[in-house]
Structures are given as structure tokens and as C-alpha cells.
Amino acid sequence: MLISAPTSYGKTFIMREILYLNQEKYKNILLVFPTVALLRENALNMEELNQDKKMGYNVIKSIDREIDCQDRNIFVLTPERAMQLLAQYPNIEIDFFFYDEMYKIDEDYCNDETDDNDEKKNSYTERTFLDEARAKTFRICLYLLSKRVKDYYLAGPNLKREKFGKGMQRYIAENNIQVKEIEFEPTKRIMVKAYNKVIDEDYTNLPYLEKPGIVKIHSKVNDRICDVVNYIEQKGYGATILYCTTPAKANEYATKLAKNHQVNVVKNERFSEFIEHLKRNYNIDGSINEWSFVNVLEMGFGMHHGKMPKYIQKEILDLFNEGIFNLLFCTSTIVEGVNTNAKNMVVLNHSKGTKELTVFDFKNIIGRAGRYYHNFVGRYFLVDKELEKFEHTEDLTLNFVTYDDQELDPVDIDNSEYMDLSDINKNLKHKREEQFKEYLLTNDIYEKNRLIKREYQEMLLRFLLNNNILYNKFYRYLSYPDILMQFTTYHAMNTVLDIFEESGLLDSIIVRRYKAVSNTYCNEGFHGLLRYEIDNARGDKVKHKSIDKAYMDAFKTQKDIIEHKIPKILALFETIFSYASLLRRKTLDNFSLSKVSRFYETGVKSYIGEQLIEFGFPVDAIKRIEDNNLRLLSMDASASQKYILEHLEDIKQLLDSYERGLLDKALKSICS
């Protein structure tokens, strides 16, 4: 079943109803969400449903521990984690899956690579195996799940069957999928023109209501923003999100509005503690005084974008939804499925990063004004004249290229069954399979990292078989009992990166950068990355670099390199090194880099630390707990939870007041 319904209609509510009604039928359930923010929100909802209705499932959000596939499990994962589940447990029987925001299988819809990015990518990063378009992950994950699971529910907003491309039509037909198009809008949305000399609300379809009078506004964009905000407040229209194309624009608009528009800052203890926490944890030699994010918060506005640490993003959303502040500047990350209490959406720009918005992006953004069962009327203000064209632009064609006639990428071809391909792609697949007969790499090894081209995996395998020096250098690290320490203290990551450079998978510029970032992070944590960027800005090593840009670059480095690309390198390396060792007849005793990958992904070393990260707890606070309670590093789930509860008062002494309050909430969730 595929359900297309307006934004905030309640598509996940339908999913929960399906699960409740079929709890006797479904044992292993997989719920796939596009972002970690949505994953966390829905995992919490599933935990509450599971507990309230006594459904008897384990709710699992990551694949970092041994899983009993014979038990009753609800997996709440991103597409990347879902692929990891299929790779680690190839024989798992999934009885039902839900796939949210399924339109992201199409590159025209899924331009995630431009989200929150205000500068063009360096050309060399486009050439590595680490930079595949995210739509490919969505597409291959959905393709594989559709092949192995009978019952599933696909969801997306504003999808029209008449706009399905040939490939999408074939996918629907081949899999006997019922399509339900719901056009009923539970929330009435009023378009407001604010790009000329006046604010003009469109009441064309509301003849029974008195239209507000036209209000004059200024021509300069920052003055116009101030006029629109004043208008919303004077009319009592409620909470407002202001969409900006990049974090830099969000900083600029929010800072200038704060100077010209006074708001009554709500006195709230948690809000005050949160600001003090930020000042204490993100200050490098007074840099906090120049960081617009904190300055804007103190003036009573919120700011949200995808480069921020996850717990900060979550706190900002919670404070906004609780009414601590009524104005929230954001980029595209907040409007892609995350629910808020916003009644108004002010759209300030017609682009998304360096690319222009699509009509689909536009509909998704304005769909965040008002929410089903919360606000029955929402308003969207168009401050940029270029936005009006989206009111009259036709929807994009949604395609599933695997089933289409166009020539496919090698990764798509290798992950598709022969009979699903067009004639041209069947020929390409046949040629590739003939080529693979000369390969040492087997299918089962390839499929553990099936989003990485087979050619690259073969290159790495042959290098590890032929280069004794680097193979043996890494092999010696395995003679020590603590593999994580070999990476965090003795720079085993440098050896891995040398192997990727010498094998031709990464060039020297990237390797030098990744080594520096990894070594700094292992020695000094995020503060080391931030200090490097702050020093660059203050020393004028990078021309015209602001302190705001320094914070942004540090967050981006952590998210892009530390949390994403290094774990991807490690996953491939673990698989190929293990197979090369088998061919070399070298003994490996329980070799696994999963603990190392989790360290880079999360920044913590203990099981309880990983649970706290999943809840949304500050990494630096967890490190303080771990450093002062080293026994936690060797404890399993139940032992670490018991230890924390027994030593809770001592542990709280290591935390600030904001962190203490957050810890209490986290433990209620983790230990329930």
C-alpha cells in the first residue's frame, strides 16, 4: 500500500494503528525514516505504544549489539541502518515494513546533499566512493525490502499517481501495490503575499470571513522580515517558523531582527540552564560572545539547522513547541517530517542550499504551517517574489529508475534482479557479471557493503592481498586486547587511511585531512575541532572567516567526516580485511570494528553512553561520566544501568544543572 496525503495528515498514526491491529501476525517489524530526528521521535512513540498496549516488542534503534531475530522486534531505523540490518542478518524474516518519505528514492526529490550547505562542495569530494547520492540508498533499500517482505506501507506527501514515471508505474504494478491518494486538507492554509509593498492575505476561498486590511511594509528584506513578524504578533497568529536557505542566512536574518524587534523573553529555568550549558561547553577563549546562535537565543528567538549536535536540535524544538519562544529561524531540515506547533511559516528564500527549491520542497515547507488536530488554520507568508511561481508550477515526475528504461549506475545494476531491468540494463548487467568471474570478491562479501561499487571493493581486496607491509602493520594492532584503544590512542586509523590511499580509493588530500580530523577528535574531542576553526578565524588563516562560520565548519566536520565518512570507511575495511585474512590463511579471533565505528558515530565508548546518545544527551557530558567511571566501559546494558542508578548522586556532581535535568529524563526512558 502507498498512501499519499498532505503534510501533517497523520500517516504515521495510520502505521501505528496497523501495527496494533496486527500484533499477533507480525513478529519482526521494520520502520524506516529518512532522518535521525524522525527516527528518535517515532521510536519514542513506538516505545509508548508498545508499553501502553503491552504489545511485547523490543524497540531497536541501532544495529550495534547482538539481536535475537526470533524475538518480537520493532526496528526503527534510517535507510542506512536498515541496510546494515539486512547485511548483518541476511536471513532475518521481516513480516511488515513501513517506509516514510518514500519519494526520496528519486534524485529529483532527494536533494539532501544540498541541505543546509551554503557553499559548493570541493570538486575532489565528488569523486570518492563516500559521496554516493543519498537517493540511491533510499532506492536500493526499498527495492530489497519490497523483494523480501509481503506486507508493507509506503508513505509520502503530495504524490500524484498521474505524475508517476514509467519506472514508478512498473514498480507499483510488479509489486501489486494499492495507491491511495488523499487530497483532503485537515488544515486550512492561507497564502499571504509579503514580497511587494504590502502584506496581503488571500481570502479567496474564505468568503464567509472578513479579510484583514492591507498593511504597508518596507522594501529591504530585513526590514520586511521585521514588518511581517510585527504583523503576526499584532494579529495574534501564534508560533512562527521562518524558513531560510542556509544557516548563514538564518544567522544574518535572526541577528538583524533581534536588533530591531524586541520580544518579551519568557522566564524559564530550563531555558536559562540550557543557555548557561552552551556558554560553558562551547566557549573557546571568549568565542561564545561572538556566536550568533547563543546571542539570538538570549534575545528570545530560536535557530535550528541540521549541522547542530542532535541534542541541541531537539532542545530547540522542545522549547519552541512549549512556547518558550514563538519565533524559530530554520533551514530545510526542520520542515522534512518533524512536527512542530507552528501556526505560520514565513518563507524567506526560494532556494535550498545552493540549489533552487522544487515545487515539492515548497509544498512540504508551507505544509508545516498548522498541524492536524493541533491548528486547523495555518498561514504561509511569501517574502521572496520568486516563490509565487510555485503556486502555479506542475508537480515533479516521481520515478523509480531501477524499473525505467534509462541507463543505470553500476551500483543500481548490481543490486537489481535481471528480470526487473530494461533491455539496455540487462545487457549491462550481463557484461558486469562476466567481468565479475575474474574477481576474487564473492557475492556474499560484496553484499555486506553493497552500496559501494564492486570495482572499489575488488581494488581494496587485491591491495590487501598483495601489500604485505600495510597488511601486517594493521594485523599487528589485533594482537592487543582493546581494539578501540589502538584507534583512539595509537592511531590505527592512520594505517587504515594509508591503505585506502595506496589502494587508490582515496587521494592524498582527503587522507591528510581525515587523518588530521581523526587524530584531533581522538585526542581532544569536538573541542579540538572547534578550537582549530576558531583559531583559523581569529588568525585570519581563512580570509573573512567569521566566528559563526567557525562554529558551522566544526559542526559540519564532526557530522560529515567523523560521524558519517569514517564509519563508512571502517565498515568496508572490516569486511574486506576479514576476507583478505581468510584468503591469506591468517587467524582472526572475533575481529570486529563495530565498537570503533560506534565511537566515531557517537563519540562515546560505553553501552550506557550509546543509550544516552540515542536519547539525545550531550557527548561531552557522557565523556565526563565515562572518564570518571571507567568500569562502565566493560559493562553490558543491565549492569551499566544498575551502576548508574547506584552512583547517581556522584555522577550528577560531574554535570551542570541542565545536564542533570536531562539525565533524569533519559534514565526514565532507558531504565523503564
PLM feature spans:
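Conserved C-terminal RecA-like helicase domain
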Residues: 2, 6-9, 13-20, 24-74, ...
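Conserved segment of the helicase C-terminal RecA-like domain
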Residues: 146-152, 351-399
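A short beta-strand element within the Helicase C-terminal
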Residues: 93-98, 327-351, 363, 378-383
